[in-house]
Amino acid sequence: LFDERGFEATAVVNFVTKFRLTVPREVMEERWKSVPNIDRLYRQQSVIREGVNSPYVMRAIGAMESIFLQMERALSDDRPFLMGDQFTLAEANFGPFLKILEMVRFMDFWLDAYPNVRAWWDRVASRESMKQLDSFPYNAIADDSAHAWTGRETAPAFERKLKEYREAFAHAYTTQD
């Protein structure tokens, strides 16, 4: 389910929101001088410079939509967790990435189309180990946190991109088999 596409997509969400709006461009330019991975460098530069108009944003949306679709299908048999009745490494691995969507306030509009994934997230998020993420510095519980305000600022444009993606690829990304 969750492979390198999910890691990259989560990074794009973080860069198009928090990093783009809170880190001065000069700091990013300096940081990029030491990024050894050309794909990561180009992705970061594009997302910082172009915002939601970066082609990497659409790719990130596609990756997450594919993951959410697979999750929705897996959870459609009323199992509580991805592999069945038990919390597994699948939840431990993917939960923190969905936490980013929650932190930037994208969770509600993104998961409207995936009620089983939303219910799964609610179960995962209610676990004590996941709640502990809220106690770390730079958490996004507060509405004035960097993740929260940058997410709210970016959300309308990002939501339009998500809608655009869903309209363009509705034939490929439906919850029906």
Descriptions of predicted regions:
Residues 1-126:
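GST-like fold's C-terminal all-alpha helical module
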Residues 113-177:
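Long, positively charged, glycine-interspersed low-complexity recognition regions
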